[in-house]
């Protein structure tokens, strides 16, 4: 919870521990377009690729890592060759998992009630990117946890 401007955030190292504890291997690789990727083998093993040379801040690393772990933890993978698989559905599931860890709903509500309402300030408070903060807010609006309009950019 937000007390005296401090909150207990999920540390980046904890995200690496979550991956390790679930048997997900993290590999550094060249990913100039996406910066990160996740995949599951037919045997159920998960792998996450991260390009450390494309990620500039710890907030970006946390967001990419949490999103990719979200794919692995929820089994939300799509088949690029299937006409019947909906990519956005799997991306939303991964983002929901990541938002729950990086921007917990009750802590976000508390921050908003305390007057932290600018997107940049919320992103800074939760140590995430502004883009991910907006996605988290959108997720909580879709779930009915926050009421639109949730925030003014």
Question: Which stretches of residues belong to each language-model region?
Answer:
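Active-site hotspot residues in diverse enzymes, especially metal/ion-binding acidic/histidine motifs
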Residues: 1-153
